[in-house]
Curated annotation (Swiss-Prot):
Its EC number is 2.1.1.166. It is an enzyme of class 2 (transferase). The gene is rlmE. It comes from Methanococcus maripaludis (strain C5 / ATCC BAA-1333). This is Ribosomal RNA large subunit methyltransferase E. Belongs to the class I-like SAM-binding methyltransferase superfamily. RNA methyltransferase RlmE family.
Amino acid sequence: MGKKDKRWVLQRKNDHYYNLAKKRNYRSRATYKLFQLNEKFNLIKERNVVVDLGCAPGGWLQAARDIVGDKGFIVGIDLQTVKPLPYENVIAIKGDMTKEEILKQARDLLPEKPDVIICDASPNISGVWDVDHARSLELTTMALMTATKMLKKGGNFVVKVFQGDLFEKYVQLVSEYFDKAFTTKPRASRDESAEVYVIGKRFNGRKFDMNSKSPIVKLLDTNPKENEITSPSLRKDISKEDSGLMIKRIKEMRSKKE
């Protein structure tokens, strides 16, 4: 075992939330992030209907189930297969959240439009800061777009975003669809992490505007034949061309800001 591996193992042993999650049979330390976000912003209530985008390995599904109880309902969507949880009111679908057929599956399972949409998904990390920032924005913008398609009016939204020079533009975009937009970093987030959570309270019912002047929307690629969004962030085989295009877009937006 190398020095980095030993350091990682030691860090996990000393990680309060990792140990707490393991002790209480939660699948991820991130479970406590949702608990803390909900405590602060009152996003999810008992009996609510919730959709979890990018739900693997299931930590946020567990947290949401603890909050809504046995009278609520939760559907998760992820590209990976998620091991089923022992609750009749928690179902995970394997698929791409940007595909209409997957959203239809989710809608068919739900008893009504969701009260809350949550997303703790992370893009595939390249190690190149501009690319990872762009991928994060792309993924979180698609989560926002999905929320505007599914949420009931007055519903809530929470999504993880990596900080970067276009972060505030994303917050502004969220505020176009919700009465209030907030940013926060829960105690369970590691200090060294670049993650921040964006909260949208009370969905105003607007449809997502693909013609928006927001620079964030320009990170998305529309497939004109299928009228769907194509997402390099959701593919493990992301190409050098995709990465280069993202860097180019980020640099163009940065130069416009200046």
